[in-house]
From Swiss-Prot:
Pfam families: ACP_syn_III (PF08545), ACP_syn_III_C (PF08541)
UniProt GO BP: fatty acid biosynthetic process
Alphabetical UniProt keywords: Acyltransferase, Cytoplasm, Fatty acid biosynthesis, Fatty acid metabolism, Lipid biosynthesis, Lipid metabolism, Multifunctional enzyme, Transferase
Subunit structure: Homodimer.
Superkingdom, taxonomy of origin: Bacteria
Reactions the enzyme catalyzes: malonyl-[ACP] + acetyl-CoA + H(+) = 3-oxobutanoyl-[ACP] + CO2 + CoA
Protein's name in the database: Beta-ketoacyl-[acyl-carrier-protein] synthase III
CDD domains noted in UniProt: KAS_III (cd00830)
Keyword check for Cytoplasm: yes
Amino acid sequence: MEGINLNQIGVSFKGSGSYVPNQILTNQEISKKVETSDEWIKSRTGISQRRISGLSENVSEMGYKAALGAIEMARWDIETIDLIILATSTPNDLFGSAPEIQSKLGAINAVAFDLTAACSGFLFAAITATQFLKAGSYKRAVVIGSDQLSSYVDWNDRRSCILFGDGAGAIAIEGTNELDNLLGFSMRTDGQRGSFLNLPSQNNQDLIINDINFSSGGFSSIKMNGQEVYKFAVREVPLIIDNLFKKTNFNSEKINWLLLHQANQRILDSVGERLNVSTEKILSNLSNYGNTSAATIPLMLDEAIRNKKIKENDIIATSGFGAGLSWGAALIRWG
């Protein structure tokens, strides 16, 4: 859809949705595959189980179902959506899975594209969407985080296979000329530390014609230096949120909720402690779903909204962090 040049000064958050596969993989079941135990996994990660996609499920299908939930909560007509951004690192079409979601929704007036920033992806995508809306280019946006990391896990590596699950979440955002509910944001990247967490390409030489080498593309499994990623998260995430507090004249007492990327319960607890955020304000569903990458924040958000935990006008400090290395934070007022 063409830009509509509205006089919008802010955004409002109109709806949320989520979807997780039916298949549940427990710690006990993983312990039959690798040398580990339920107690070992829970004590180090806080995870008890995770959802795994079935053969007929993929990023587009999960993202579509999450988006539908957000659109229904917002009570929008599908044709009024201008923008769809899919945050994913595991598209079922490497050229982009957002157009497939657009097609499934029937959102014929929306431009749709993928954004890749790993576990920071949803936050980065949501911030990107708000800037289009605040510029007056579009009126209504759906932002989706959907990932299927189970397809890229080395199921013989107990350090990483215990962490990840599949799922999707989405939010509906609308441009407004009233109060801006995006109170502030910050985004950062440090590519020099990218090797701490990555999913590298893997090329295989297949054919030689006239001394020209041809290779088929592919990817290996997730590579992670858990200790370095932990140190990165507990150092950088409190810092970026605290700096955002200072810029917006907020503090830990003025927020209602702390919503972090659901990577590891130890990280959530440590960040909360460093920010002096009380435990009851820290949102966590990590035990049930594990790390669903770009889906963790909207999945937790939707769960808290539908359980009537998060209410209209609640102030939420949120942060995504992960591969890149990338990290960011946003302060929002829900509604």
